[in-house]
């Protein structure tokens, strides 16, 4: 039975003594760079813009972008074949990529781009190449299980969450049997099957964590909150919609063996130095974070953060 649990957190619960070391990521010549994933080998992925365009939502770009990966300091710019638009949203430890693309010959799709350079396109039943609903792959683990969501370009939240594996979709809508829930999204999947994401529940956008049949929902500082990456330790990352990033260690392990007792996770601030807003998106099993920050002038940049703990 799913359990619905909101943790209302005060800023004082942040563990400010445990910090990260940050590095900015900017693609030369780009007007904007966003990092969306990092794996245990340190491979960094994301997307960039070459023209000015204002986004509706930081999670899913409604402006044309090109993908990239950085391996051992070498930048490789990426476009799905025949595409005018390629979002690289996630990477696993083998270097397999997932994201969203619009192609000139077959329209809009989610995709899995294997490191052997084989690309698989897919769309949920609700979406399609010419639909206003778009299939956006957000994350992938080593077993090639993909987590994602359906999105409209104009919306501030996803429509429907899902996982995809071996050509088959499974709906992963937390709280689907509870009145008042909507706007689900699966934003992170770990190598051992933990899921992280978001939904709208009890008047708030809530971060969501799933381990087996257990589902937990979290708010940071009583504000709308998005859960993004998750690793095999059960660590999670995310942000409030005001741009306050956070990391929480091993939240299921903190509960002990009694699943009826919830323990409030201890949150660590994720804040790029002097940034107006910080958005952590991807998390590796080595607790490296890939994300995006907004500078004091409104410029958008990528970053990676390495834990000092």
Language-model features: locations:
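Sec-dependent signal peptide recognition
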Residues: 2-8
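Residue-level hotspots at or immediately adjacent to binding/recognition sites across diverse folds
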Residues: 17-309
């Amino acid at each position: 039975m799913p359990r619905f649990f909101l943790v209302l957190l005060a800023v004082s619960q942040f563990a400010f003594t445990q910090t990260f070391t940050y590095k900015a990521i900017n693609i030369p010549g780009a007007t904007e760079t966003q990092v969306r994933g990092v794996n245990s080998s340190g491979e960094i992925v994301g997307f960039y813009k070459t023209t000015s365009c204002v986004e509706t939502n930081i999670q899913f770009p409604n402006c044309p972008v090109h993908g990239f990966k950085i391996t051992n300091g070498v930048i490789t710019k990426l476009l799905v074949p025949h595409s005018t638009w390629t979002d690289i949203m996630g990477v696993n430890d083998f270097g397999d990529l997932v994201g969203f693309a619009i192609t000139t010959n077959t329209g809009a799709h989610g995709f899995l781009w294997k490191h052997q350079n084989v690309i698989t396109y897919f769309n949920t039943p609700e979406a399609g190449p010419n639909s206003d609903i778009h299939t956006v792959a957000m994350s992938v683990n080593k077993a090639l299980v993909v987590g994602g969501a359906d999105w409209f370009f104009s919306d501030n939240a996803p429509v429907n969450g899902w996982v995809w594996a071996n050509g088959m979709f499974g709906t992963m809508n937390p709280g689907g049997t509870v009145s008042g829930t909507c706007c689900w999204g699966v934003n992170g999947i770990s190598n051992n099957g933990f899921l992280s994401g978001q939904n709208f529940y009890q008047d708030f956008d809530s971060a969501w964590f799933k381990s087996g049949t257990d589902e937990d929902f979290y708010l940071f500082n009583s504000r709308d909150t998005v859960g993004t990456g998750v690793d095999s330790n059960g660590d999670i990352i995310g942000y409030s919609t005001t741009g306050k990033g956070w990391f929480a260690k091993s939240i299921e392990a903190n509960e002990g063996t009694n699943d009826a007792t919830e323990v409030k996770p201890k949150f660590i601030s994720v804040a790029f130095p002097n940034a107006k807003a910080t958005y952590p998106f991807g998390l590796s099993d080595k607790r490296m974070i890939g994300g995006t920050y907004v500078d004091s002038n409104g410029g958008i940049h990528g970053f990676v953060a390495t834990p000092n703990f």
